[in-house]
């Protein structure tokens, strides 16, 4: 939006980034936005580039297709990782659990976290990137699980990768973003300014 008297007002533009928006800016706000405390990645080998290093794999899981994969039906096990930092917290702390399903042909995948009670956080059944902020209390053993059995009993067949866990706080914030070209034919809104309040 262009205002008179020479000033420029940014619209709250929620449109998808595209070629015709390159160079334009938008303003947005967010409530309880997860903000990394240090940015230190707590997961070991989240992209499975080092095979099963850092992970415990249940029967039926294997590293293939760029991630942890279940390729046959009726697999009712999990992959899991124990994070010492989470196990050693001295007060309730929030963490962002993130993973990507790059392929799925059946069932759904469930995320569980020891908070310290064994708690289901998500049950997802489509390709995509998923992230959840979970508050973990003292007494947790630091373990989280990706289960191949859905709550309905159907079993997951597919691939999960790019697993990440970060310590976060949740803040209200406002943002100024600019649309930028990030590849031959890809465009993204890139944050330029962030203000918490």
Question: Model features per residue range: what roles?
Answer:
Residues 4-22, 29-175, 180-197:
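Polar, enzyme-active/binding microenvironments
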